[in-house]
Amino acid sequence: LMRSFVRALEWADTLGLVRLALTRAEFAYLMFPESPLSAPPYSQAPALAWMQYSYSSGTGLERLLNRLGGKPLGFRSLSCSESPVVEGSNRIWKDCTVRFSPPGGSAQTLQLFASIIEREGRYKILSYANAF
């Protein structure tokens, strides 16, 4: 996932970055039914929950591409929370930060996306909401 993320960001490949993120169908059928948002006391409609995720993710993706897209990143490491949040079959890794050192620049550690979802050994970016 990170290799693909870095490559897509360095090439400013919007479609490549979108493909790494959870889709509306994956959210509706795989994530939402096992999310606390689907049960009381929240009992949100799936469309409302998706709208909230997709809005913040879309804004974050645009900011990410504007700030870092098309430039060598100099990826060093990824760090997420020590333990994932478990929601049924889904494991959500939060507080993810990326350490990178662009050529000629100083090392930085930033939140380039909010979280990663893992399900049955497969990983996707849950949201591109970020520190920008």
Language-model regions, residue ranges each:
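Short, low-complexity, Pro/Ser/Thr/Gly-rich segments in the mature regions of secreted, periplasmic
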Residues: I117-F132
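Short, surface-exposed beta-strand/loop "edge" segments at domain boundaries and coil↔beta transitions
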Residues: G104-T109, F132
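Surface-exposed, charged secondary-structure patches
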Residues: S35-S106
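Hydrophobic/aromatic beta-strand elements that line small-molecule binding cavities or substrate pockets
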Residues: Q111-I117
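A sequence-level detector of short linear motifs
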Residues: T109-Q111, I125
